[in-house]
Amino acid sequence: SFSDTIKQCDRIQVDGKVREMTDDDRLRAKKANAEYASRGLRSMALAYRVIDRDVDINKMPIDEAESHLIFVGLTTMSDPPRPEIYDAVKRCHQAKIRIIMVTGDSKLTAKSVAVQIGLTSGKARVISGNELEKMSDDELRKALKGEVIFARVAPEQKYRIVKNCQANGEVVASTGDGVNDAPALKQADIGIAMGQTGTDVAKEAANMILTDDNFASIVAAIEEGRAVYSNIRKFLTYILTSNVPEAIPSVLFLFSAGLIPLPMTVMQILTVDLGTDMLPALGLGAEAADPDIMNQPPRKRSEHLLNKGVMIKAFCWYGLLSSLISSGAYFFVNWQNGWPAKGLAASGSVYMRATTMVLGAIVFTQIANVLNCRTNKTSIFKKGLFSNKNIWYGIVFEICL
């Protein structure tokens, strides 16, 4: 690094001539380095030492060989962020996903790049590897709760950062490519190794390999994961709903001591469960993600797939409404055919028409149900009524069956 190199220099080369290096020379070099770093450039100090030919450099101690150097100047390199990183960082902020930069660059360079890509507004605390070494775990956990950037950090220190993030209750995904990154990748909830530049050790320790080494691909994977999780919940809501109109008539049959015959035969129940419901339910699995899925905060670690919201929607809302419609259809057919309110026929043409009406009512309420399940918040017309053709293939099959 610049700071390590400049400490070993006691002379400077100016216009081809070598002279003693003054404090003013050091100050100018430091100012130039800071200026480059503030612009997001990576600077490297160039220095050399003249050694006599009769000296075997391979036998010289490293400390001696790298001392009394002649400072030549600075060279800079530009490593601009990929164009897609700006949108990826923005989407992470919208999804309430925190990004903590851990880099080997200088503090100024790290902060400049972070501001440039929109990672921070410029108020983030920048902690160097040396400062991190002196911090206690309590101090580190406190720092990790706010905006923070880690600069000049050794790969081995990433493990400590990951572990203390987890101590704060965070679900941590860590990226890395080197052998020394393996402990952090192993400790993280999701270890992500670089596919192109990553070592075999890092890939072995990771849970996931990023084939294109692109941060934007991680964000895309998060969106896809959220979409799959959401679709599973939609699938469960749809499947569980039909159990209510199937179960309530059976309960009425039991409590009426047989005065109200079963509104659905066993064959009709199997037709709904194994026939008409299956294809539309599978179509929900191919549903595109909701437009606002990346505007929602991450779910809690303790939250179950089959949560209270799914149960209420399936059993107390969609299911109850479907039960009222199907039961109403059953009693309506009997009433039309002179039901005297003293008992219902358990066989005959009236009973067959009534059970057929119940089956038809459940099928058509399930059609409405599958369309409702496609989106949680936005209107189905806004998302596109016919955008998921698989569901409509299932609906046509359901009606034909």
Q: What name fits each language-model region?
A:
Residues 121-174, 188, 193-378:
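Membrane-embedded transport module
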Residues 1-164, 168, 182, 196-197, ...:
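Cytosolic catalytic headpieces and adjacent flexible linkers of membrane translocases
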Residues 306, 311, 377-399:
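C-terminal membrane-solvent junction of multi-pass transporters and transport-like membrane proteins
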Residues 177:
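Conserved catalytic-loop aspartate of Hanks-type protein kinases
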Residues 185:
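Basic, alpha-helical nucleic-acid-binding regions used in initiation and control of genome expression
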Residues 248-249, 398-401:
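Hydrophobic, membrane-inserted alpha-helices
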